[in-house]
Regions:
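Radical SAM enzyme [4Fe-4S]-AdoMet core and its adjacent flexible, acidic
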Residues: 1-134
Length: 134
């Protein structure tokens, strides 16, 4: 797993250099797609929400987000609308759900959680019903 404290320490160090510009670019995936407002609200430098995990059999793509969770995410984006999230709203509204792909993604996460000693639902509780069914 990434050592985020170390990574963010390096980000702050690079930001202190006069000849260095730091930007955040989130890779939008099935797990973080509902949390882009957090990036907008907490980015202390320019950011981009322009990278999307996408492709055939790409288990972490938005096709793995079930309708119930999409509705939760969309409700957040509608309630606290920002122009920067227009593409994300469109993805959540229009990309077709694939239950098989979601199951593969959650199995991959469950295997990783076992290896790392972590648990998906500690960070993303909205996935509980799906994660615990495996």
């Amino acid at each position: 797993p990434s050592k985020w404290e170390r990574i963010m320490g390096n980000v702050q160090r690079f930001k202190s250099f006069d000849n260095c510009e730091v930007n955040y670019h989130a890779t939008i995936n099935a797990l973080n797609v509902g949390y882009m407002l957090d990036i907008i609200d907490n980015a202390d430098c320019p950011f981009g929400l322009d990278n999307l995990v996408y492709g055939d059999n790409e288990i972490y793509s938005i096709v793995s987000v079930p309708p119930e969770i999409r509705e939760q995410y969309l409700a957040k984006y509608y309630l606290d609308y920002r122009k920067e999230t227009d593409a994300i709203i469109t993805y959540l509204e229009n990309i077709e759900y694939d239950e098989t792909q979601m199951t593969c993604m959650l199995q991959d996460i469950k295997d990783r959680d076992k290896y790392r000693g972590t648990c998906l639902i500690d960070l993303f509780p909205e996935w509980r019903n799906y994660y615990e069914k495996l």
